[in-house]
Amino acid sequence: PSNPIVSVGTILAVPGVRAAIEASAAPVVAVSPIVGGAAIKGPAAPMLTALGYEVSARGVAQCYAGLIDALVIDQVDAALADDIRAMGIEVVVTDTIMRGPAEKRALAQAALDAARQVAA
């Protein structure tokens, strides 16, 4: 789960990158870096606020609207899933906090499963 503003946003700002992703037939999946209304780490929360987005998985979905096909969100934020789906974004709810290798593998698998789901 990367900061959608400074990590992913800077990559998307490279000329042609966003357009290439939007034009691709490949499924695009993001993992929300916001859990329970707070950033997992780093400055994502104040940056989302500064740009007018809610500090939530829903705000992350709004930030990525039109770009992603699916968003992996934490179980804590499961109540937001229907709001995100209403934006046309598929949602996978799982534990997104990576405490060790097993959790990292499980989150990666959830993202892959989301990609397969939207590609089907």
Give short role names for the model-derived ranges:
Residues 41-120:
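C-terminal functional extensions of proteins
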Residues 5-63:
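Conserved phosphate- and dinucleotide-binding cores of soluble alpha/beta proteins
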Residues 1-2:
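Hydrophobic, aromatic-enriched interface-forming segments
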